[in-house]
């Protein structure tokens, strides 16, 4: 049996006494040392785990971490308790997300628009993007500006900036509220549905890289791409992947699931080591 300490250490986390903290492999797949959303502990022989960032399901955490489920002893009562806590947490986070979205203003004419235009993006900016001042950045404890993107689940994605308009160097992108299965709609068009990871990537595709009108969605992360809920009616789908292993794996997983549901699927991988905003700006791989 794998206990809480084993899982914590396997995820690259820290164990202190009777509790561990580690990166959540679902919503923090980078597993950086500053990422510690997942709390784990053993209590009365029961395994308890909770993701404080996204409220991720522990069974999905186990799967994403590559841990053998047949060696896990999950107590049903503990799992029900974790599920109830996750539901309460998600409701509270969703309320915070809607409040932030409600006070944010349209992105046109803001430092957020200046940032996007500075990255070569020329397409009209969607109503799903707004700009907010004085947004709390948890990892640093500072109050910063943020580009706020509305997710189809009601959650928001935040990209944090200094008051000068420069994007902060670390932990710049964070989600607020339940995002699983959702996406940010960046453009609407009569052509195919195009799914990518990042917001800047999607806007870059809509800035002339596709060669045809399209509906563009940003799934916000590689795990988000894998979990994306597609429209019920199948059609044409272009999966625009980042040029790395995580992007390739996520894109192929989405493509396979879509194909099985009757979608006509095309893969559009970025060059190795690049994303589509790099391509738009004429960058080349090192």
Regions found by a protein language model. Name each.
Residues 24, 51, 116, 149, ...:
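Terminal peptide-recognition signature
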Residues 122-139:
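Short, basic/aromatic recognition patches
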Residues 1-119, 124, 245-249, 259, ...:
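Non-catalytic accessory segments of DNA primases and related replication-initiation nucleases
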Residues 223-224, 241-251, 272:
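Acidic, metal-coordinating catalytic cores used for nucleic-acid/nucleotide bond scission
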Residues 137-232:
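Phosphate-handling DNA/RNA-contact segment within nucleic-acid enzymes
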Residues 74, 218-221, 264-274:
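A generic structural motif
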Residues 230-235, 277-286:
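Short, surface-exposed amphipathic charged segments that create phosphate/polyanion-binding patches used
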Residues 195, 235-246, 269:
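Acidic beta-strand-to-loop metal/phosphate-binding motif
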């Amino acid at each position: 049996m794998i206990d809480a300490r084993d899982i914590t250490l396997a995820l690259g986390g820290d164990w202190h006494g009777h509790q561990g903290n580690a990166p959540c492999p679902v919503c923090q797949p980078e597993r950086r040392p500053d990422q510690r959303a997942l709390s784990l502990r053993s209590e009365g022989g029961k395994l308890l785990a909770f993701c404080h960032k996204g409220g991720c399901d522990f069974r999905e955490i186990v799967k994403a971490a590559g841990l053998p489920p047949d060696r896990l002893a999950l107590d049903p009562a503990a799992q029900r308790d974790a599920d109830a806590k996750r539901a309460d947490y998600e409701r509270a986070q969703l309320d915070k997300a809607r409040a932030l979205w409600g006070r944010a203003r349209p992105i046109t004419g803001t430092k957020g628009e200046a940032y996007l235009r500075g990255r070569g993006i020329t397409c009209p900016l969607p109503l799903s993007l707004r700009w907010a001042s004085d947004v709390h950045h948890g990892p640093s404890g500072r109050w910063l500006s943020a580009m706020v993107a509305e997710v189809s689940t009601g959650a928001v994605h935040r990209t944090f900036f200094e008051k000068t308009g420069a994007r902060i160097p670390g932990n710049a992108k964070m989600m607020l509220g339940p995002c699983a299965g959702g996406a940010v709609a960046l453009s609407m068009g009569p052509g195919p549905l195009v799914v990518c990871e990042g917001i800047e990537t999607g806007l870059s595709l809509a800035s002339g890289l596709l060669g045809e009108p399209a509906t563009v969605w940003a799934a916000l992360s590689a795990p988000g791409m894998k979990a994306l809920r597609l429209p019920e009616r199948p059609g044409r789908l272009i999966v625009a992947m980042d040029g790395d292993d995580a992007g390739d794996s996520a894109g192929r997983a989405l493509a396979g699931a879509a194909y099985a549901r009757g979608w006509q699927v095309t893969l559009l991988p970025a060059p190795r080591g690049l994303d589509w905003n790099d391509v738009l700006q004429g960058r080349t791989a090192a």
